Amino acid sequence: MKAGERALFETAFRYAEAYKDKKGNDKYAWKINMSYLRANDWEATNMDPSSDSRVEENNPGGYDAVNRYGDEDETGGNDFSNPFSARSYPGLGIFHRTGYEEQNLVDYDTRNLKLSAAFHYMLNSKVELIGASNFGTGTTVYQGENRFSLRDILFFQNRLEIRKKDDWFIRAYATNEDAGRSYDAVFTAFRLQDAAKPNGDWNRNYSTYWNQIIRPRAYALPGMPGQFSQNYNQGLADSVLAANADLIRLWHLETRGNVDQNVTGNQQPFFQPGTARFDSAFNSITSRLPSEGGTMFFDKSALYHVQSEKRFQWEAQKLVWVVGGNFRQFRPNSAGSIFSDTLQADSTYRVITNSELGFYTGLEKKMGDFKANVTMRVDKNENFPFVFSPAASVVYAPSEKHVYRVSVSSAVRNPTLADQFLYYNVGRAILLGNLTGFDSLVTVPSFIDYLDSLNTNRLQYFNVAPIRPEQVRTIEFGYRTMLKKLYIDAGYYYSWYQHFIGFNLGLDVNISSFGLPSSVQAYRVAANATDIVTTQGFSIGGNYYYNRNLAFNFNYSWNKLNVTNREDQIIAAFNTPENKFNIGISGRELITKIGSLSLVDWGFNVNYKWIQGFLFEGSPQFTGFIPTYDLVDAQINKNIPAWKMNIKIGASNLLNKKVFQVYGGPRVGRLAYISLNLNL
């Protein structure tokens, strides 16, 4: 049982029992597990300008905030900062639509329930039959392609296995899920705005109000040059407007309020959070599928997996041969809310399945102080060719204190279901899987250049080839040793990726006969790198055992991604800090005397972590820099053997430093807790 800050309450229960036959041999056993967690999650309230915001927080017309949705520049018509527009619309500049803060769109109360049960039966003295089931349900906020509110999600997994320990096994399991009442928080903000008035109308209403009501006031400011004077001085106009910055800000607030509330035709006023109108619109949107104008997920996907393995051992020759294989089938079912299993003309949904088949074999041979291992694996996804992955490793242990290892390996990563079949609108862009390729996308930087000049020759086009499996070759060196009281383990790797899987960002742009963009749609397309991508890294960790009760530990890692072709449009989404380390001290079974008091059988641990800042690449809304941060975790514990109990009191992030761990997520602070563990 565990309780702590943020209304944390967690409890877990496990019970197991085994039975023997009349001869005293193990015959069957069963176990059940249950855990429940409840807490108030940290709220994502980052109102800093997003990495894509073209203006800062002090812009009088607003800005694009990280955790405010709907204030993005989606449709254009909101930029009046060029010299001609600045003269016709003085003080208007760039403005952003009134958005919705995430805290008004999601429930931060986290709840999670997990149940599992297993039954083991010995068919004979060596062969065991296992049946197991797992169930999970919960509600939380999750960050994936967008910020999602997961409500009443369900997970089921059932496994059947027959095995002979250290000899062979046949295993089959099925995983099923149900999205429950989950929805996309970001897309919900867009739907709320659409229910009020389209973005294009909102932008036109804003500029029209400014032109008709605010412009005369601006030109009436003392010192402001006349709009139609032949020698119009833009620098003078800018200085007058800057001197009246507070007034300009008030005019923008006035304009925003007017545009949010004044409507025509089928338009509606802004849905203000906390009102019955907002609740009604919100509930309607989050209870309908995207195809019905809502943002609710439908996901009743399934995964079926079968695997078998056989081991052949020749003890005299110190040789082991392993052969095995697996078959896996994915059956996504999202009714078009996540994948491209969309509604067809005959009112049925497109059915998607995806199957994978793999075989592997390996030899392990011990020769004195050496142990060699050679393996080969072949994988086949129904949408891609066969891929072969050989590997070899050698371990040299001249003594118990020194172990050297070297390996040359290869691996394959088949494109995921999302890489193949995703079709998901996140507002700023449509995220696409990519089995067929994509032609004539416009690079985002060239489109921005084009907008400055309306010169179509500045547009740069590129194609995206169909997605294919990612292959990696890795060489690794390692060493571990025990020097008296000091244990050290260090390793270095270098990897070469061919067809590294990431994504490309591009625009599908239609240009009118007047040279103006008539439509613009942003896409994030799953893609492979066009050149070799390399990664390398080094890690070292160790423990120093001062005595049997006290130990020090440390760990450092360095990881680096290298994209050699700078013209490649790939976005790798590596999302890994280049440097990080932690150091700590721990004690166990301690005896401490304080005056006449004696505290026995207690322990503690304190750990310091440092993580270097890094670029977090997700969806267009959630790509930005995570600043460097450090944390201290601490805990004390006490064993009470007479009660069969262990008590822990501790805190993660003890100093309560509010840090971002993902871009777009909340600032995570301290979580202090007390935990009781009872073994009956």
Label every model-predicted segment.
Residues R405, T436-A522:
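Membrane-embedded beta-barrel scaffold of Gram-negative outer-membrane proteins
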Residues N158-L343, Y349-F384, D489:
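Face-selective signature of the C-terminal outer-membrane beta-barrel domain
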Residues F9, A16-K22, D26-Y28, N33-L37, ...:
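Conserved C-terminal beta-signal and adjacent last beta-strands/turns
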Residues M1-A7, Y19, Y36-N40, F135-T139, ...:
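Transmembrane beta-strands of outer-membrane beta-barrel pores
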Residues K366-D369, Y492-L615:
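Gram-negative outer-membrane beta-barrel transporters
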Residues N112-R147, D152-F156, V322-F330, A335, ...:
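Surface-exposed extracellular loop regions of Gram-negative outer-membrane beta-barrel proteins
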Residues K20-Y28, S125-K126, D167, R171, ...:
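Short loop/turn motifs that connect adjacent beta-strands in outer-membrane beta-barrel proteins
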Residues K2-R6, E10-R151:
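Periplasmic-side early beta-strands and strand-to-turn transitions of outer-membrane beta-barrels
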